[in-house]
Curated annotation (Swiss-Prot):
Family of this protein: Belongs to the heat shock protein 70 family.
Induction: By cadmium.
Keyword list, A-Z: ATP-binding, Nucleotide-binding, Stress response
Protein known as: Heat shock cognate 70 kDa protein
Gene behind this protein: HSP70
Organism the protein comes from: Petunia hybrida
SUPFAM superfamilies: Actin-like ATPase domain, Heat shock protein 70kD (HSP70), C-terminal subdomain, Heat shock protein 70kD (HSP70), peptide-binding domain
Pfam families, per the entry: HSP70 (PF00012)
Gene Ontology MF term list: ATP binding; ATP-dependent protein folding chaperone
PROSITE patterns assigned to the protein according to its UniProt record, in alphabetical order: HSP70_1, HSP70_2, HSP70_3
InterPro entries associated with the record: ATPase_NBD, Heat_shock_70_CS, HSP70_C_sf, HSP70_peptide-bd_sf, Hsp_70_fam
Amino acid sequence: MAGKGEGPAIGIDLGTTYSCVGVWQHDRVEIIANDQGNRTTPSYVGFTDTERLIGDAAKNQVAMNPINTVFDAKRLIGRRFSDPSVQSDIKLWPFKVIPGPGDKPMIVVTYKGEEKQFAAEEISSMVLTKMKEIAEAYLGTTIKNAVVTVPAYFNDSQRQATKDAGVIAGLNVMRIINEPTAAAIAYGLDKKASSAGEKNVLIFDLGGGTFDVSLLTIEEGIFEVKATAGDTHLGGEDFDNRMVNHFVQEFKRKNKKDISGNPRALRRLRTACERAKRTLSSTAQTTIEIDSLYEGIDFYSTITRARFEELNMDLFRKCMEPVEKCLRDAKMDKSSVHDVVLVGGSTRIPKVQQLLQDFFNGKELCKSINPDEAVAYGAAVQAAILSGEGNEKVQDLLLLDVTPLSLGLETAGGGMTVLIPRNTTIPTKKEQVFSTYSDNQPGVLIQVYEGERARTKDNNLLGKFELSGIPPAPRGVPQITVCFDIDANGILNVSAEDKTTGQKNKITITNDKGRLSKEEIERMVQEAEKYKSEDEELKKKVEAKNALENYAYNMRNTIKDDKINSQLSAADKKRIEDAIDEAIKWLDNNQLAEADEFEDKMKELESICNPIIAKMYQGGAGGATMDEDGPSVGGSAGSQTGAGPKIEEVD
């Protein structure tokens, strides 16, 4: 159970391009809208000279500030800088990415006039913090516990890094769950009334940056994943890129100018392409109109749905490969699939739907769940189950997920010996006995890999450790038991033990290369707190400034009102007008003042205006003299060189 006073547990779909948050409330899931009224929030963080923006505010200013607005952190998280996919992305991103220690990609931005470096985990943690705050604003309580989703095809380091992002955001990540599995819960609860018996369901999840296919068997509230496949680097953004390149070429042809080096022009073009792509899902052609795109040249063009499909045809076809692989792995024929469920915004593309439908021999696709919200919905249900908040409808749901990649270790000659084959249900534990390769070998090096190839050099090294202190013996005699243990988050622990001596060593595979250390995470948590308090400071400042501005303009309108105007003496009226003019002029010149300066100015202005207005309301001459005596300290001082509030503050 979640501790009391922590508020309910929430489910967060941390997406490449958009994120979404849900909570279990009143026996159902509520998907929570942000302060702009949107139920999904852009996974964007913008840095300016004065503030840090997250979500809609960041995405809205991206054209003005492309190099300091970070998005796509999910395409970096848990990857190395030298990863080919990172290298190809860097060519397309307007912000700067450099290699940090241990080949870890670091994002470089200018914030408040100084250069700052952030890891992908930190950017993701800012988005998670935003989602947490959206939920807190709606629920009116603080929130500590969350279930966060990742693509099913995320590997160990990507999962671990996502968990770290949660820690930096001050969340207790109760569980990392796979996006298609979360969507399957949404589907299962949606269909629960009508279904009897076992159902085979294929979840086709094509989002902004990642692609997953999972095949599940759902029966009586048990969700068993049979197989999963996917591409952690394929999604709507790749379709946008194709369209952007298409128009860059067209601009070159028409105007003999290359805009590809201009981040602002590219960003405006990308925004227009994103909009055009969405429009083409419902109409056959659309226009792109961008005024003064580059060197004062207006860009007007049209694109048809057919052309868009042609630009992306290879990518769309690529989406079918994991579907085949998934069915093969599950040893299931496509005719045995009862329902094909669409998840993720990119599944709205008609061509993707058509290819999928053709693959399943014309079968109707299931579109009954909201593709943008299904994942957060499922995560919220899982959060309710784990914290014991759900009702009996969900408490008996059981999720049996699988590990997406085979796990094993390197044996003599660089071969990969698999201990846990891919699509094994997790949590799981496997042991195997190994021995030494040469006589009197004092230790063994255990190197853990994930991947499907026969040679370890073609797979991904997760980590390694040494088991030493083996007593001298001929080769093949010592018995070393190696145990692989995967928890429910899909994160691996490996231990090795020498049977004769009882020597033990173990490692939690947390990708030594890219993994943040405890100290780094601590530091990032503190920095996150610092940024948060800076954001709050700024908010206070803006509120104080607005309060002063409102007061001044309202007062100006008040004294213009005929009823009031007629009751004020000319001298009083002039005093108020002068004070207001002075305050407004001060405001114009001191936009960047601190909150307390705005507050002081406000007090000063009030000390002049309020007594006069109060005197007017009392109206009687007798009252007036009393009144003038009363606040004269503040009043008279206030009119001289702004010393007013200083006197007030003494008491």
